[in-house]
Swiss-Prot record:
Keywords: 4Fe-4S, ATP-binding, Cytoplasm, Iron, Iron-sulfur, Magnesium, Metal-binding, Nucleotide-binding, RNA-binding, Transferase, tRNA processing, tRNA-binding. It comes from Mannheimia succiniciproducens (strain KCTC 0769BP / MBEL55E). One of its GO terms (biological process) is tRNA thio-modification. The gene is ttcA. It is an enzyme of class 2 (transferase). This is tRNA-cytidine(32) 2-sulfurtransferase.
Length: 312
């Protein structure tokens, strides 16, 4: 190996380590900010075979070695009996990394196909069926937390989906309790960018399994929102970061929901807690979010160069 090749190899290793540290830091911060994992927890990581859930499992396993609390991990995959689903991939992968796992076999694919007319969106029914099965499995395994692989971009997409199509100011919470009060669901990737997860999944060479059930629905409303946000991100760098910051800084007195703020009892001469005066827009110019050029990064995996360059 020449001196130039050695230098390039070191740079690529450095870039991968930087990416991994960034993901670990973001996951660690989310866990701490929302008290997602506590001492003695058994965390059930829902593994679909996609880039997000693989990354979630990998980072949690990595963090567990240095975490200030002890927690166990069990990976769970729901085999929905989709035609052509490669049943061997996840058991082989999970066995190779030595993690406890369970494969749950339920023919939700057949139910969805039976109930949903051809050409209609299957996501709503599919997600409800999956949720019920995963909650039941968590109880059977004695899991105290259910970890899902939704990331920052998913949360913003959900925000706009609810605004545009549902008339609600609502996103995905980083932590929630199930309707029956028996399960706690956490999203440790809440602070992670999808671009970082994509790069990490390729660099780690996870055996990705595509979802053929919903992948054949190109006109999904979520896909429309995703493309809109991606366009904004390319044209206006920093906008996504600013929007995510917005859902962490809510001012109920400047919205229109009387359930969140007592507008009826506002009196002259009073400045109740939570009121920020008569300024609707805080500044003429939004504060600039520092933008780090993370779009071009080269990694080495098993001696092979993996190059990432985002195309605008």
């Amino acid at each position: 190996m020449t001196e130039l090749e050695t230098k390039e190899n070191k740079k690529q290793i450095y870039n991968f380590n930087k990416l991994q540290k960034r993901l670990r830091r973001n996951v660690g911060n989310a866990i701490a900010d929302f008290n997602m994992i506590e001492d003695g927890d058994k965390v059930m990581v829902c593994l679909s075979g996609g880039k997000d859930s693989y990354t979630l499992l990998d980072i949690l396993l990595n963090l567990r070695h240095n975490a200030p609390v002890h927690f166990d991990i069990v990976a769970v995959n729901l085999d929905q009996k989709q035609p052509g689903f490669p049943e061997h991939i996840l058991p082989e992968y999970l066995s190779s990394i030595g993690v406890e796992y369970k494969i749950v076999e339920e023919n939700t694919y057949g139910i969805v196909k039976e109930k949903i007319p051809e050409g209609k969106t299957t996501c709503s029914l599919c997600s409800r069926l999956r949720r019920g099965i995963l909650y039941r499995t968590a109880t059977e395994l004695g899991a105290t937390k259910i970890a899902l692989g939704h990331h920052r971009d998913d949360m913003l997409e959900t925000l706009f989906l609810n605004m545009f199509y549902g008339g609600k100011l609502k996103s995905m919470p980083p932590k929630l309790v199930s309707d029956d009060g028996k399960q706690i669901v956490i999203r440790p990737l809440a602070y992670c960018k999808e671009k970082d997860i994509e790069k990490y999944a390729v660099a780690k060479q996870f055996p990705i399994i595509p979802c053929n059930l919903c992948g054949s629905q190109p006109n999904l409303q979520r896909q429309v929102i995703k493309e809109m946000l991606q366009t904004w991100d390319r044209r206006y760098p920093g906008r996504i970061e600013t929007m995510f910051s917005a859902i962490q800084n809510i001012t109920p007195s400047h919205l229109c929901d009387p359930n969140l703020f007592d507008f009826k009892n506002i009196k002259r001469g009073q400045l109740p807690k939570g009121v920020e005066g008569d300024i609707a827009f805080d500044k003429e110019e939004l504060p600039q979010t520092p933008i780090i050029d993370e779009d071009t990064e080269d990694f080495v995996n098993n001696g092979q160069l993996i190059r990432f360059k985002e195309v605008n």
